[in-house]
């Protein structure tokens, strides 16, 4: 039994150390990458999103349809 207990202890030791190292290594990279990707990602998508929304602007289609009626109403009121 003593041989089995020693083997179990040895097996448990390496995994625990490996887990600690693995946890520390990945833990540090994610935050660093997060900040790096966060800044560029927010800037890159921000510009493209604004530009992309401008050309398609699904709101413009309905707005244009309402625009004529709104302009006519404002003109009729002005007159």
From Swiss-Prot:
UniProt keyword annotations, A-Z: Cytoplasm, Keratinization
Biased composition (Low complexity): 1-26
Family stated for the protein in its record: Belongs to the cornifin (SPRR) family.
Annotated GO CC locations: cell cortex
Post-translational modification: Cross-linked to membrane proteins by transglutaminase.
Name of the protein in question: Small proline-rich protein 4
Role noted for this protein: Cross-linked envelope protein of keratinocytes. Involved in UV-induced cornification.
Gene Ontology terms: biological process: keratinization
Biased composition (Polar residues): 66-79
Signals that turn on the gene: By UV irradiation.
Keyword match Cytoplasm: yes
S-S pairs: none
Subcellular localization, as worded in the UniProt entry: Cytoplasm; Cytoplasm, Cell cortex
Segments for region (Disordered): 1-79
Organism: Homo sapiens (Human)
